[in-house]
């Protein structure tokens, strides 16, 4: 990392904000590039696969016949990591897991300035959605489209929960949301 490249997390942390990262991280984890090295006080990211096991009864999967999709599905186990620590398996669908953790960050930091960078995996491949969300898409044609739409439904639910939490805590009016 060049010293003249400053992240928004570094700027806000220097200004007294608590900074948290939840989700995808595409800058790498070596040589000063991890979220904690880039200005985040705390970071929760998935370090293995980004989806529940294929045979999980609560989800529906959709696959594409492409080399990248095959590689992603074969890439490893569902595992998260907090601040570079040991890997652990989240107990639910990734969009819901990220959302629940984001709600905790908001709740725990409501009385001080905070910056939450929530980078959902949805609607990225591999395509996986909760069975309950896919069932709501029965009016659509095509298995992959139903699963993709189920992922959008979960993402929409996530944004709704976050906005609702901000309103419940009476901090919505002084919050900037970038989506």
Question: Whereabouts are the PLM-identified features?
Answer:
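Formylglycine-dependent sulfatase
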Residues: 1-179
């Amino acid at each position: 990392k060049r010293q003249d490249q400053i992240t928004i997390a570094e700027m806000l942390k220097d200004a007294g904000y608590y900074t948290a990262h939840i989700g995808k991280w595409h800058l790498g984890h070596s040589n000063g590039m991890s979220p904690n090295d880039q200005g985040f006080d705390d970071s929760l990211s998935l370090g293995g696969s980004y989806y529940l096991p294929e045979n999980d009864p609560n989800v529906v999967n959709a696959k594409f016949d492409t080399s990248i999709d095959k590689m992603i599905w074969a890439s490893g186990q569902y595992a998260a990591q907090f601040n570079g620590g040991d890997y652990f398996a989240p107990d639910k669908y990734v969009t819901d897991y990220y959302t629940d953790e984001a709600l905790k960050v908001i709740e725990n930091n409501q009385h001080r300035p905070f910056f939450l960078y929530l980078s959902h995996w949805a609607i990225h491949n591999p395509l996986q959605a909760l069975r309950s969300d896919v069932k709501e898409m029965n009016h659509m044609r095509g298995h992959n489209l139903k699963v993709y739409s189920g992922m959008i439904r979960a993402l929409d639910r996530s944004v709704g929960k976050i906005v609702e939490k901000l309103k419940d805590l009476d901090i919505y009016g002084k919050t900037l949301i970038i989506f």
